């Protein structure tokens, strides 16, 4: 099965399934002599892992990462870095009732049609559990970006359902309280929105339903010049990486779809000797980073694994009514914050290495 790798010079390949023995990844291209241990990776995995909040799935996984290769005497060697996380809390019996049926809104049908076989246990390879290894690789990329270039990649939850954060609390990036973002269960920068999110998730769990979400990712201190026009534009690669995350249905760079109602006189980011006057473009012009903060917004669909009965068909194309059992997130966007950060960091590091190779 192709499509398991991302990047050219900094390349990440993941493997493993939701209910398999383990998840893993191979990282190629990280420069040598960077100090690295499991302790550098684990904090981001802890932000993503299940079973740590009443707002997310009840599946409990330690998500303890182990470095298998590419590190000697506490430093990267420049060779392939192998990482692995063992699965411990699989409950495959929850999925026996769907082994011959297709869950509406899931990848069951398309995987079966494409490959003629599928791992029905928790979605197999299509499960969001696969993203644990992206987060692990992204933590390494974030460390290198921060130490070598001062680049910070951070994200926050901006909306669940119809409930949005107060836009004034993020209008000035420099004033975002990132400590608060990382210390509340919703990764939300707006303290007034947290209790509203709490009430919404409680209601969804009682109803057995789910809701979509919107996240914002911000990369600061990105140098000018990253991006390879025309087909490897930085914004194109970021969109590709973010769209590859499970349940993501839309990506916006900068003002995104709001540009439709803007005039050119409003949208253009005017320049002065002291810098740009605005950042409607989201830090990317002509597919190349402008030196401004890179801003992306991503939309997550509501998960289809819900207790509300739905119509579907079985392997024999017979009509059925299905209720999805198991342990699932009422809003997958909550745990997606470190995943989004990871994908942006992976793309930025790849483009930084490509920039250095081409332009010195």
Swiss-Prot record:
Broadest EC class assigned to this enzyme: lyase
Keywords: Amino-acid biosynthesis, Aromatic amino acid biosynthesis, FAD, Flavoprotein, FMN, Lyase, NADP
EC number: 4.2.3.5
Name used for this protein in its record: Chorismate synthase
GO biological process, one term: chorismate biosynthetic process
Listed NCBIfam families: aroC, PRK05382.1
Family to which this protein belongs: Belongs to the chorismate synthase family.
GN (gene name): aroC
Residues annotated for NADP(+) binding in this entry: 48, 54
Organism: Haemophilus ducreyi (strain 35000HP / ATCC 700724)
Pathway field: Metabolic intermediate biosynthesis; chorismate biosynthesis; chorismate from D-erythrose 4-phosphate and phosphoenolpyruvate: step 7/7
InterPro entries, per the entry: Chorismate_synth (IPR000453), Chorismate_synth_AroC_sf (IPR035904), Chorismate_synthase_CS (IPR020541)
Example GO molecular function: FMN binding
GO cellular component, one term: cytosol
Cofactor binding note: Reduced FMN (FMNH(2)).
The reaction(s) this protein catalyses: 5-O-(1-carboxyvinyl)-3-phosphoshikimate = chorismate + phosphate
Keyword GTP-binding included in the entry's annotation: no
UniProt function note: This reaction introduces a second double bond into the aromatic ring system.
Keyword check for DNA damage: no
Subunit structure: Homotetramer.
Cofactor: FMNH2
Amino acids binding FMN: 125-127, 246-247, 286, 301-305, 327
PANTHER family reported for this sequence: CHORISMATE SYNTHASE
Origin superkingdom: Bacteria
Signal peptide as annotated in the record: none
């Amino acid at each position: 099965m192709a499509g398991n790798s991302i990047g050219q010079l900094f390349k990440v390949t993941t493997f493993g399934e939701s209910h398999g023995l383990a998840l893993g990844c191979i990282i190629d291209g990280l420069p040598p002599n960077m100090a690295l241990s499991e302790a550098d990776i684990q904090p981001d995995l802890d932000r993503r892992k299940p079973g740590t909040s009443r707002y997310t799935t009840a599946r409990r996984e330690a998500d303890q990462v182990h470095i298998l290769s590419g590190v000697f005497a506490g430093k990267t060697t420049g060779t392939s870095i192998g990482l692995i996380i063992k699965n411990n809390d699989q409950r495959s019996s929850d999925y026996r009732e769907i082994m011959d049926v297709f869950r509406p809104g899931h990848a069951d049908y398309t995987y079966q049609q494409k490959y003629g076989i599928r791992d029905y246990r928790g979605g197999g390879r299509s499960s969001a559990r696969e993203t644990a290894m992206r987060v692990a690789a992204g933590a390494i990329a974030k460390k290198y970006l921060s130490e070598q270039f001062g680049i910070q990649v951070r994200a926050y939850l901006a909306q669940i359902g119809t409930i949005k954060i107060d836009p004034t609390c993020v209008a000035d990036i420099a004033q975002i309280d990132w400590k608060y973002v990382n210390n509340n269960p919703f990764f939300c920068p707006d303290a007034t929105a947290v209790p509203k999110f709490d009430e919404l998730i409680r209601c969804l769990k009682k109803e057995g339903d789910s809701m979509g979400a919107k996240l914002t990712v911000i990369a600061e201190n990105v140098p000018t010049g990253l991006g390879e026009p025309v087909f490897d534009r930085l914004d194109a690669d970021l969109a590709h990486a973010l769209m590859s995350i499970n349940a993501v249905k839309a990506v916006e760079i900068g003002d995104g779809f709001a540009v439709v109602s803007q005039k050119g006189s409003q949208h253009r980011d005017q320049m002065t000797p002291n810098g740009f006057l605005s950042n409607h473009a989201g830090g990317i012009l002509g597919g190349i980073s402008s030196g401004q903060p890179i801003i992306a917004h991503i939309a997550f669909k509501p998960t289809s694994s819900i207790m509300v009965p739905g119509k579907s068909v079985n392997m024999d194309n017979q009509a059925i009514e299905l209720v999805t059992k198991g342990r699932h997130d009422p809003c997958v966007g909550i745990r997606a914050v470190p995943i989004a950060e990871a994908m942006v960091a992976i793309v930025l590091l790849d483009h930084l290495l490509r920039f250095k190779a081409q332009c010195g």
